[in-house]
Structures are given as structure tokens and as C-alpha cells.
Amino acid sequence: MNLDKLFHLKENHTDVKTEVMAGITTFMTMAYILAVNPNILEASGMDRGAVFTATALSSFIATCLMAALSNYPFVLAPGMGLNAYFAYTVVLGMGYSWQQALAAVFVEGIIFILLSLTNVREAIFNAIPMNLKHAVSVGIGLFIAFIGLQNAKIVVNNDSTLVSVFSFKSSVSGGTFNTEGITVLLALIGLLITAILLVKSVKGNILWGILITWGLGIICQLTGLYKPDPAAGWFSLLPDFSNGISIPSMAPTFMKMDFSIVFILDFVVIMFAFLFVDMFDTLGTLIGVASKADMLDKEGKLPNIKGALLSDAVGTTVGAMCGTSTVTTFVESASGVAEGGRTGLTSLVAAILFGLSLLLSPIFLAIPSFATAPALIIVGFLMLTSVTKIDFNDMTEAIPAFIAIIAMPFLYSISEGISMGVISYVIINVVTGKAKEKKISVLMYVLAVLFILKYIFI
């Protein structure tokens, strides 16, 4: 098989080695979803083992589609935030069964497919102004960095200031130095190691940073510096093969959708919430990562975006059938792009690893969050550099861009950043009389109105 011709590697100024490293890196930075998603959906009453298999399988299928239909280095998996909405709001909060929630996700996926085939999502992507697209990239960078700081527990909750820096003297979560403290220290060391590797232009610097940090953690565990305490949430860093190699059955969740919810008034609200967050998280990720990788053309459009959007839509539908919440394009795809990934070969490698994770789950689940956190922080820095592309000389462009940027990390949502960016862009340009001069797309006005209505009624 000629991978160069299949994925147009030379045209995209990349090679097989770079793409493979990028795919591995992306997978490593988002492998946590294999552990986190089952934990979250289990709260809704779903079988943990079945959800693990559904998570890995739906990620594999959706990411393979991304490689085949778009030839872009984007990787898909059940989205964080959407899974929490599924479990804690729809099921535990509103009282619906997880089977009914899966039906809502399935219907959302079907609508997504129709929207993708009719170019609606592509039109939305193209309607967003270039400066706002660069702002989305920067905002996602800050958002990723903040997630990394949280995963490393460098940033912790604070009742007075909402967040504060971790203290080795007093842990807010009740951990000790040998459980929590040492992992924070390892994350900081890992951040410095990854930064130095980046400065030295070491190939695969982000992946090496993850592996070295994990390796240091294993050494700390073997020497007694890190003491696992599973009951308190501090797990062993060594892969556990005590149960051998087996794939958990997906039977408890496969095709268990209950469509009786379709006839309930709340269904429209539930489905729209899934639809809205999935659509604009995906668009935000595509805009941000593609902008950073210089994949956008001179008009700010992403060639062959339809294939990427269709892969995302089909992934959501397949995910619901398997038994998991909404599948979406992961912002961690930026880590692979930062490693030089530019084609579908990157996503194919990540997809294969998701497939292998079904058999080698003990290895992938042993990679701790403190080892992947430095990678997220560094990727955040790399995406932040797009701020230089924003036109700060034009306040009608700069202020909406600023609002979009700060909204993402502060509101912990890519879609909220896009919403506020679009609303502020339209209002500021209309009031200042710049709208006609800039020929703002009609679709931007429609989006602004829809976003305002969302804040009023949802």
C-alpha cells in the first residue's frame, strides 16, 4: 500500500514517521476518555464494561471515517461535557432513563447527518469571519491549557476565588504528598521536560514528554514515593493484567434506545442541547486546529469540510447504537497537529490504537492524567500563538475576538466562546455602522439571533 499516494503526504509536507508519531500523541492525550467516560455514564445506571467497549469502538469507527472521508488529522470520541449532561442532567436531574437519553443522542446524530449532507454546517463554518476563527484557535488553546492545569491538579477549587494554585502543605481534596503531592510535582517536572524538548526541536517532543513523565511516576511508585490508594482515587501506575486480556461485552447497552422519549415535550429541549453543543464544539475544534495547522484557504474555508462533519455526525449515531453519549471531534487533536500531523494517516493511527485498546486496556488505562497534563498545557501554548494573526488595529474585530477567547476557558466551553463571539461581533459591527462595509453574512445574523434565544430560553 502506497501511503504517500493514499494520504497525499508530500502535498501536505509530511511523512509516514511524522504522521504515526502524531497519531500516537493524539491518542495518548485523549486516552483518558476510555477511563473517564465509563465512570461518568455508570452514574446513569449503564454497565461500565459495556460503556468502555462502546467508547473504544465508536471512537475507532468515527475516526476511521474521518481518515477516509476527509483526510484530516482529527480524532473523535465521546465528548466530555456532553457525557456529563447525559448522565447528570438528563438522567439523574430530569429523571429519564439512560435508554431514553440514548434515543435523544441517536436522533441528534440523524439530524446532524442531514445537516451535513445539506451543507448547513459547512455554511456556518464559512460564515464566521477570519479574525473570529483565529480567536477560536486562541481560546481553545487557553481552554486546553486550563484543562491540563486541572488534570495535573496544579489548579484546584477554591470557595473564595473559584480557583487557586495547589498547596503542598494543605490539599483541598484530602490527598497526601505520597498520593497527590508527588503527582503534582511530577506534572510540573513533565511540563519542564516537554518544554525543553520542544525548544530543542526533538521529534515527538509531546509524546516523549508523556512517556518520560509516566516513567518517572512508575519509578516513584516502585521506590515508595508514590503510594497508590485506589479507595481515594489514587491508582497504580503499573498496567494490571490480573484479569488477562478480554473485551467487555457491549450487550447491556447495544441498541438499547427507548424512543418513547420522542413523544415527550422535554425531548426537543434535550435533543437541541445535545445538537447545539456538539455542533459548535465540533466547528470550534475544526476552526481552531485547522487554523493553527494552516489548513484554511485564503478565504478562511476548510477544503473538504463536508467529509469531516459527516464523520462526526455518523460517529454520534454509531455511538448511540453502541451505547455511549455524543461522539465529537476532540480538541486534543491539536496535540497531534502540534507534532506535525497533517493528514488522515494521523487519525487512522489513532483509530487503530482505539481498536487495540479493546485488547490492551490495562496499558492505556494505566497512563495517569498527570503524565498527559503537560502535553495539554504545551499544546495550549502552541495554539495561543495564533493570537498574532488577529487584527487588533480594528476594534470591531479585536473586541469580539477577545470576548470569544476569554469565554472559552472561563466558561469552560468552546461552544459558549463561539456564541459570545458571534453575538458581540454582530452587535458591535451593526451599532458602529461597519456591518454593510464588511458584508457580514446573513447566516451570522441568524446565528446571533439563535444564540441570544438560547440564552433566554435554555
Give the label of every model feature segment.
Residues 13, 17, 189, 268-272, ...:
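Alpha-helical membrane-protein architecture signal
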Residues 59-80, 111:
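Juxtamembrane transmembrane-helix boundary signature
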Residues 2-37, 58, 79-88, 92-140, ...:
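Helix-loop-helix junctions within the multi-pass membrane cores of secondary transporters/permeases
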Residues 24-31, 64, 68, 145, ...:
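Hydrophobic/aromatic residues within the transmembrane alpha-helices of Major Facilitator Superfamily
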Residues 94-212, 348-458:
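Membrane-embedded alpha-helical modules
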Residues 45-64:
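Loop-to-helix transition at the N-terminal end of transmembrane alpha-helices
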Residues 1-50, 169, 210-305, 449-453:
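Helix-loop-helix hairpins and the membrane-proximal interhelical loops
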Residues 39-50, 89-100, 264-268, 368, ...:
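Helix-coil boundary and interhelical linker segments in multi-pass alpha-helical membrane proteins
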